[in-house]
Amino acid sequence: MQSVFEDLYSKKILEEEFGYTCFLQTLIDNRIPYKKTRIPSNMILLTEDTINTKVYFIEKGIVSLEKNKNVISFLGSNQIAGLNDYFMAEANLYTARVIETITAYEFNKEDIICSIIGMQEGWLYLYLNNRNHENVLIEKCNLMRGNGENRLKESLEQLGRYFGNEKEGVLRIPKCFTKKIIANYSNLSVRSVTHLCRKLVEAGFLAENSKSFVLLDKYGKIEPEVTTI
């Protein structure tokens, strides 16, 4: 159902005028202090149940969002970590962990909130950011309704759609999405993922002996690579 806000502002206008690119440029134009930083894999950006003071506008790379060690979602290019609430003293809901080295613009959260409060339509930046995040969570909830094989297949399709690289008729998921991470996200054991991957290879959905997860379904098959998944 379309919200009241989206009746006033079309989806296209919201994305063009209040999306990631415009939000970041507005902060820079308003001389909000920031530093551009490169953060390697396995580093923690934010810790759940801890008050955070930083916000990261991700230019490149991938971050996992975890709750009680369960992977809930992922953030990638043109997404924001650390701005899912409007209150300075609000503790983080998730732990944000870098799984593929990121390049990001790092701001103080207080500076961003104060800047937004001073804008006539500043709240729309927060609304759009949170709406996009909620859509991802809804997708995850729907994914969890299936059986193990369907959960794995749909997880791989989702990650391929958001983070994959389509080339030579196939869709290759970044190597940072290991079996362990995929298993956690799909609510499966690593052993189950290994078993189900064999079935998906036999079904022509995955490439065999690939260095990363490679989706073949609807893309056509490729020559197998040397190492196993």
Task: Locate the predicted segments by residue.
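Cyclic nucleotide-binding regulatory module and flanking cytosolic helices
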Residues: 1-41, 81, 85-86
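Short, small/polar residue-rich loop motifs at catalytic or cofactor-binding pockets
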Residues: 31-32, 50-52
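Short phosphate-coordinating micro-motif centered on Lys-Gly-acidic
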Residues: 39-40, 44-50
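Glycine- and acidic-residue-biased ligand/ion/polar-headgroup-sensing regions
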Residues: 52-68, 77-79
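Cyclic-nucleotide recognition modules
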Residues: 72-138
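Polybasic "coupling" helices that flank or enter modular domains
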Residues: 124-187
